[in-house]
Swiss-Prot record:
Any one of the GO BP annotations: glucose metabolic process
Domain of life where this protein originates: Bacteria
Origin species: Haemophilus influenzae (strain ATCC 51907 / DSM 11121 / KW20 / Rd)
Binding-site list for [4Fe-4S] cluster: 30, 34, 37
E.C. code: 1.97.1.4
Similarity comment text for this entry: Belongs to the organic radical-activating enzymes family.
GO terms for MF: 4 iron, 4 sulfur cluster binding; [formate-C-acetyltransferase]-activating enzyme activity; metal ion binding
Protein name according to UniProt: Pyruvate formate-lyase 1-activating enzyme
CC cofactor: [4Fe-4S] cluster
Residues given in the record as S-adenosyl-L-methionine binding sites: 36-38, 79, 130-132, 203
Subcellular location: Cytoplasm
């Protein structure tokens, strides 16, 4: 009997979570507590709804033409997809049987390395790894947990030579200092499996979800970064030998 997945929702024609037009599956449950999270309602491990790989694939294949025509595919996001690694592995296997490209969007908070993680990565064409912050003190303040597990996962991907894009959320006053950006550059320097770095400007599009849940949004007064700030960060990271986009 196939493993059931607990999902929050899906987006049929996503264009920002991997190449081309993609079917984005938002898995339910996350162990990080990002203060800027725009999917606050995905944290609860018991929330969402259950679905089988078979039923999910019935939905996915209806969009195959759009995905194939644009070099797209499917992306497992969240929440945190790796918390349900067995289900995502089975889903990606089904996608590969249909010739559909697979992408794993993850924060890298992997607690146990076992055959399921390896089997998931074996059927993953691209990993989008969210490196939130290299300064661990800032990371714990902003994200709620240490960054050790994510950094370990980044090194694991390097060891596997796994195709990877790094994603870095630029939050003014938190992740945009020259010192912290240099820490990121130094960490990923020489990681030849990294194809590019994506700078994701902080935004406030998810604030209403916090308020709907009756929760305080601590970054209420933080404004998005300026283009000049993003260009400056881009220049620093390019100095470490990587392609950088925003």
């Amino acid at each position: 009997m196939s493993v059931l997945g607990r999902i929050h929702s899906f987006e049929s024609c996503g264009t920002v979570d991997g190449p081309g037009i993609r079917f984005i599956l938002f898995m339910q449950g996350c162990l990080m507590r990002c203060k800027y999270c725009h999917n606050r309602d995905t944290w609860d491990l018991e929330g969402g709804k259950e679905i089988s790989v078979e039923d999910l694939m019935k939905e996915v294949v209806t969009y195959r033409h759009f995905m194939n025509a644009t070099g797209g595919g499917v992306t497992a996001s969240g929440g945190e997809a790796v918390l349900q690694a067995e289900f995502v592995r089975d889903w990606f296997r089904a996608c590969k049987e249909e010739g559909i490209n697979t992408c794993l969007d993850t924060n890298g908070f992997v607690r146990h390395y076992d055959h399921i993680i390896d089997e998931l990565l074996d059927v993953t064409d691209l990993v989008l790894l969210d490196l939130k912050e290299l300064n661990d003190q800032v990371h714990q303040n902003l994200i709620g947990v240490p960054n050790k597990r994510t950094l370990e996962f980044a090194k694991y991907l390097q060891k596997r030579n796994q195709h990877t894009w790094i994603r870095y959320v630029v939050v003014p006053g938190y992740t945009d200092s020259d010192h912290d950006v240099h820490l990121l550059g130094q960490f990923i320097e020489g990681m030849t499996n990294i194809e590019k770095v994506e700078l994701l400007p902080y935004h406030r599009l998810g604030v209403h979800k916090w308020k709907t849940l009756g929760l305080d949004y601590e970054l209420e007064n933080v404004l998005p970064p300026t283009k000049e700030s993003l260009e400056h960060i881009k220049t620093i990271l390019e100095g470490y030998g990587h392609t950088v986009k925003f």
